[in-house]
Amino acid sequence: MTHLACIAASDGIAIAKAYRFVQPNLTFSQTTVQDVQAEQQRLAAALAKTEQELRPSKQQTLKKFSAEEAAIFEAHLLVVKDSELIGPINQKTADEGVNAEFALHEVSSMFVALFESMDDEYMSARASDIKDVTNRILAHLLGAHIPNPSSISEQVIIVANDLTPSETAQLDRNFVLGFITDIGGRTSHSAIMGRSLEIPAVVGTGVATTTIQDGDILIVDGLSGQVFVNPTADVIVSYQEKAQSYHTQQAEWSTLVNEQTVSKDGVHVELAANIGSPGDLEGVLRHGAEGIGLYRTEFLYMGRENLPSEDEQFTAYQTVLEGMQGKPVVIRTLDLGGDKHLPYLPLQEEMNPFLGHRAIRLCLEQQELFRTPLRALLRASVYGNLKIMFPIIATIQEFRDAKAILLEEQEKLKAAGEEVSADIEIGMMVEIPATAVMADVFAKEVDFFSIGTNDLIQYTMAADRMNEKVSYLYQPYNPAFLRLIQMVIHAAHQEQKWVGMCGEMAGDELAVPLLLGLGLDEFSMSATSILKTRSLLKRLSVKDMQALATEALQVATAEEVMEKVKQAVK
């Protein structure tokens, strides 16, 4: 038995076989071949295996999603059988006596460059199809395996170096019981998505992919941050009992599902949920959320080969707004860039992508990328209580420009006879220290603030939240950071505006008492944290927590703040 200590990322306990999700090494050299026919047969075998791999993926996608998503795999199958692509590869092998890997790379690169140069969205998408299929064929030529999260059909625990947002979005929780990564922290996107999917997860192991083999029996303890590899029978029994205790506690919390969140001294605050897709609605309602405080719209764009249409986005937003039955739904406009990239939307490589051309900066430059989802949102607004917010706002001019585009699209829709709600609140994320410092200015023009602590902490402390070497500086309880939160809440309340928080701090047991004392109006978190947080808030007095917050703002270190919270709520 091997024991790994790591970072608890998503609550729960899972016991299952390991499924290594490790990208293969697809490097190769150009070689000269003597037997051209044998080399062409190698290519034919790789093509056949690729086709065998794609057909089940198409069928599974058709069952789980829709014909539109399944059409991606149909396009890939057409590439595999395209004589205009395969013919030149075989011809190059015959004419130049080169290996199939090299011929495949040279010919496919030529087609990719050709399609990417065309000023046509459909043809550009074909370039992505060729890249994807080429990698699959190359993997089979090299005897490697490209993992496909959507093809998993048995209960497993995924083991990966990291999981991108698009990969995590494809996980099916009926089969993926948990995951383990080498890198990342509690606020990394893989961790956030783990909580959204309600599956146990641990991150930052450092050695999972080098220690764990396919088929190993694993225990993932997402409560305390531990992994057991091939555990003994006694350890398995112990963790089965621990899992049962956890489920019992969840059942106790479930009695609070239909209750409002009211403090011990009668003050109501709102507990909302963070979501990434309409599929998350079931969990949101099951856990008794009083609204949605963050809908990450960029996940509509992931795990696919082209931009979602306006109608497709409209349907997603309509589904969520109707599903929440009049409860507030805060939808964030596109936050692409940083660590969220799309294969069909190439972005310039940057030295510091988190400080670069992302989110509202990208949208204000590529306005059609911005206007399409805005139109979809405005059309859907009549189906519920919609609030719209813009991410990564740094200056008041950015907010004004974004709002002007939104209002322009609203007027166009009205002129075309479309019905649009007259009561849409327009707010912004507070994720940049400059915004917090100028909150009094912003508060005069916004309808609300939502504090995005994940980015705001790393920008305040100059500490990359994905870098384990500086993780000690990622301090939600640092008095400097708490003072920024206080500034934002005070500025908003001076203008009778409300403040929410949609970062992971909003559901943190130690942070909740402080945030209640600082006057936070809305706590938005992973759905699985709502009932636990409601139980905690019902035991706290706002008056007592205000005194705690005042003390916390006067101390010098995060450690002192944490100690004061523990003493106050023990």
Curated annotation (Swiss-Prot):
GO terms for cellular component: cytoplasm. Disulfide bonds: none annotated. It is an enzyme of class 2 (transferase). It is found in: Cytoplasm. Its EC number is 2.7.3.9. It catalyses: L-histidyl-[protein] + phosphoenolpyruvate = N(pros)-phospho-L-histidyl-[protein] + pyruvate. Mg(2+) binds at residues 431, 455. Its cofactor is Mg(2+). GO terms for molecular function: kinase activity; metal ion binding; phosphoenolpyruvate-protein phosphotransferase activity. The keyword Cytoplasm applies. Keywords: Cytoplasm, Kinase, Magnesium, Metal-binding, Phosphotransferase system, Sugar transport, Transferase, Transport. It comes from the Bacteria. Its main location: cytoplasm. InterPro entries: PEP-util_enz_mobile_dom, PEP-utilizing_PTS_enzyme, PEP_util_C, PEP_util_CS, Phosphohistidine_dom_sf, PTS_EI, PTS_EI-like, PTS_EIN. It holds the Pfam family PEP-utilizers. The active site is at residues 189, 502. SUPFAM superfamilies: Enzyme I of the PEP:sugar phosphotransferase system HPr-binding (sub)domain, Phosphoenolpyruvate/pyruvate domain, Phosphohistidine domain. Phosphoenolpyruvate binds at residues 296, 332, 454-455, 465. Homodimer. The reaction takes place in three steps, mediated by a phosphocarrier histidine residue located on the surface of the central domain. The two first partial reactions are catalyzed at an active site located on the N-terminal domain, and the third partial reaction is catalyzed at an active site located on the C-terminal domain. For catalytic turnover, the central domain swivels from the concave surface of the N-terminal domain to that of the C-terminal domain. General (non sugar-specific) component of the phosphoenolpyruvate-dependent sugar phosphotransferase system (sugar PTS). This major carbohydrate active-transport system catalyzes the phosphorylation of incoming sugar substrates concomitantly with their translocation across the cell membrane. Enzyme I transfers the phosphoryl group from phosphoenolpyruvate (PEP) to the phosphoryl carrier protein (HPr). The N-terminal domain contains the HPr binding site, the central domain the pyrophosphate/phosphate carrier histidine, and the C-terminal domain the pyruvate binding site. Belongs to the PEP-utilizing enzyme family. This is Phosphoenolpyruvate-protein phosphotransferase. The lineage of its organism: Bacteria, Bacillati, Bacillota, Bacilli, Bacillales. The gene is ptsI.
